[in-house]
Amino acid sequence: YTMGTKRIDVVREQAKYEIAIDRFCKEKGGYIGIVDHFGALHGLNQLPGLAIQDLQSKGYGFGAEGDWKIAALGAVMQYMADQKGTGLMEDYTYDLVDGTCLGAHMLEVSPQFAATKPEIQVHPLGIGGKSDPARLVFEGIAAPEAVAVSMIDMGDRMRLIVQKIELVKYPHKMPNLPVGGLMWKYKPNFKEGVAAWIYAGGAHHTVVSSVVTAQQMVDLGNMWGIEVVLIDENTKIEQFKKDLMWADVVWKNKR
């Protein structure tokens, strides 16, 4: 990392969080998935940012805002990916002209995604009511094949949503984005890819991986015995909607 701040005390605070969380997880049972919430940071001066980024780089799964499903899924996918190119992600905004999605999070994007050397920076965070947190800032990698994966609770079953994506480089510098990020294009295309994600109930938290394949995730879901929804280059939205409807009937009759 490079140091982009003189506020060393803020960085040291994050180092304390990283050491403490890692030690707690190892001593209390070897946990490999963690969550936090910006509204429940009792005793902490900052939202863990740099700390969580480093822990993800070591293979921990992380779920923001208490998202335990993503933490668990991330831990499994980190293992599958040998701790490379995998981590928490969130849809931030769409570029309707280029048909791309900018993915990021308030702090905790894994440096496994870094295409540029991550820089430690300190900026205000207008949520949570805590002190300015340290975080790593970088531009994300490009990769022709990647997946964005969401796990949702359907009430009577879990659904694993797997979407093929292409990671692309930033079209230009983003000096006002003080976090790490990724950009991607949806399969089969922007319009149908976004529609399919919404129809399937895809959440805004995902685990993105440039290492784990869509087929591996489909196989994993089948091994777990849960519903798997795949969105790829062959997806046709009208047929996709029918498939979701029939799957709902089938899964309800499996109980």
Model feature map: region roles:
Residues 1-21, 76, 227-235, 245, ...:
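Non-catalytic structural scaffold of enzyme domains
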Residues 1-47:
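A charged, amphipathic alpha-helical module
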Residues 28-31, 84-91, 230-235:
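Flexible, glycine/charged-enriched surface loops at secondary-structure junctions
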Residues 37-44, 94-96, 213-214, 238:
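Gly/Ser/Thr-rich loops at beta-strand to alpha-helix junctions
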Residues 44-49, 99-103:
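Short acidic, glycine/serine/threonine-rich loops at helix termini
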Residues 46-63:
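A short, gly/pro- and small-residue-rich
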Residues 59-179:
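C-terminal catalytic subdomain
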Residues 133-255:
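Extended hydrophobic packing segments that form well-structured cores
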